[in-house]
Regions:
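Active-site/catalytic core of tyrosine-dependent DNA strand-transfer enzymes
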Residues: 37, 49, 54-117
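Short, basic (Lys/Arg/His-rich) helix/loop patches that form interaction surfaces
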Residues: 2, 76, 93-145, 149-152
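Alpha-helix N-cap/helix-start motif at helix boundaries, enriched for small hydrophobics
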Residues: 7-12, 143
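Active/binding-pocket-proximal capping segment
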Residues: 15-19, 24-32, 72-73, 103-107, ...
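Tryptophan-centric aromatic hotspots in well-structured domains and transmembrane helices
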Residues: 1, 26-31, 64-65, 122-125
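Conserved tyrosine-mediated DNA breakage-rejoining catalytic core shared by Y-recombinases
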Residues: 11-62
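Catalytic-site neighborhood detector that most strongly recognizes the C-terminal catalytic loop/helix
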Residues: 147-186, 191
């Protein structure tokens, strides 16, 4: 529902999920994807990867914010909650937090659910979001912003600010609607 890269998801810190003011002073829950000097294992693919991704309502309905609040309430020895990742149990290996998740997804999850094909892997979820938005007529520059794709315009990528979260939410995120897009009845077989 976000179109984020697997490593972007796996390397999220608790404080990367936050409310950000939109156009009308309303706050919107977002993933703040950024490279942070004090977190050297957190790397972005390119300059366009640095972005704010509004959180889809389905993820909110599934209790993501309650999960964040729970993580914030836990006492961590010698560390504040801000220094913890959302998925702290994922080890860093081969330059990524996503390596083991990718292996598990491709070698265990997909075969167990009879979804294994040569063309399906975790990255297929990004392609699904991209294609879904394209088929809904969303302009490519909005899709690129949501997905963190480079546009080829280095000036915009390096010096330009990203769209306001409300714009990306309205142009993209709220248009990500699958037939069973609800917190209790998601059918992943079509992915």
């Amino acid at each position: 529902f976000s179109g984020m890269r697997l490593n972007e998801i796996c390397s999220l810190y608790i404080d990367n999920v936050r409310e950000i003011s939109g156009n009308h002073r309303e706050k919107r829950w977002c993933f703040d994807i950024l490279e942070e000097l004090n977190r050297p294992q957190k790397k972005l693919k390119n300059l366009a990867s640095r972005r704010v991704v509004p959180i889809h309502q389905t993820l909110l309905d599934l209790g993501l914010i309650d999960f964040i609040k729970l993580l914030k309430s836990v006492k961590y020895p010698n560390r504040e909650w801000k220094e913890k990742r959302l998925f702290e149990e994922l080890p860093f290996g081969e330059g990524s937090f996503a390596r083991n998740v990718c292996r598990w997804w491709n070698s265990r999850y997909l075969p167990k659910h009879d979804l294994k094909t040569p063309k399906k892997n975790f990255h297929s979820l990004r392609h699904t979001v991209s294609n879904h938005l394209k088929q809904k007529g969303v302009e490519p520059h909005f899709i690129n912003e949501l997905l963190g794709h480079a546009t080829g315009n280095i000036d915009l990528e390096r010096y330009g600010k990203g769209y306001n979260p409300d714009i990306i939410f309205n142009k993209c995120v709220k248009k990500i609607v699958y037939e069973t897009s609800n917190a209790r009845g998601i059918d992943f077989k079509s992915l």
